[in-house]
């Protein structure tokens, strides 16, 4: 994994690791997902953590988080196989897009981006100017909004690259 990908992954991990102890607890994961508007059932969350938690401590550390990322990237990366992984990838991308597209109009606006970033406690999105710059970095057609295609391209190129 490239250094910039490792740094990006570390930033994402730290967003979920609210107390900064180097482990994402079930509570931290629940809280982060709820802030994104993605409530998860306890059983589903427990199963997810059990799949990720290689050392069995009930939490997700940076190594386990990295392993999960690498596994997802191998599945997403294409390379043959049936269409199943692509369908899951598309559905996951749509679900993530819908978190940001709060009014459901098919676009992520400056205000919507700001609201989601604020709910996550991300400082870089505190002003409309910051959010406008972030959107400008991925807005291919120049309409001042991010559509689903632009969102997918951004996610495949590095989901949090605009937060630097």
UniProtKB/Swiss-Prot annotation:
Source organism, top-level taxon? Eukaryota
Per UniProt, Ca(2+) 4 binds at 139, 141, 143, 145, 150
- Annotated Ca(2+) 1 binding lies at 17, 19, 21, 23, 28
Keyword Membrane listed? The answer is no
Q: Which PROSITE patterns does this one have?
A: EF_HAND_1 (PS00018), EF_HAND_2 (PS50222)
Q: Which GO terms describe its molecular function?
A: calcium ion binding
Residues binding Ca(2+) 2, per UniProt: 53, 55, 57, 59, 64
Instruction: Identify the CDD domains for this entry.
Output: EFh
Instruction: Give residues annotated as binding Ca(2+) 3.
Output: 101, 103, 105, 112
Q: Where is the EF-hand domain?
A: 4-39, 40-75, 88-123, 126-161
Keyword field contains Disulfide bond: no
Q: Which PANTHER family match?
A: EF-HAND CALCIUM-BINDING DOMAIN CONTAINING PROTEIN (PTHR10891)
- What functional role does this protein have? Potential calcium sensor.
List the protein's name. Probable calcium-binding protein CML17
Species of origin:
Oryza sativa subsp. japonica
- Report the gene name: CML17
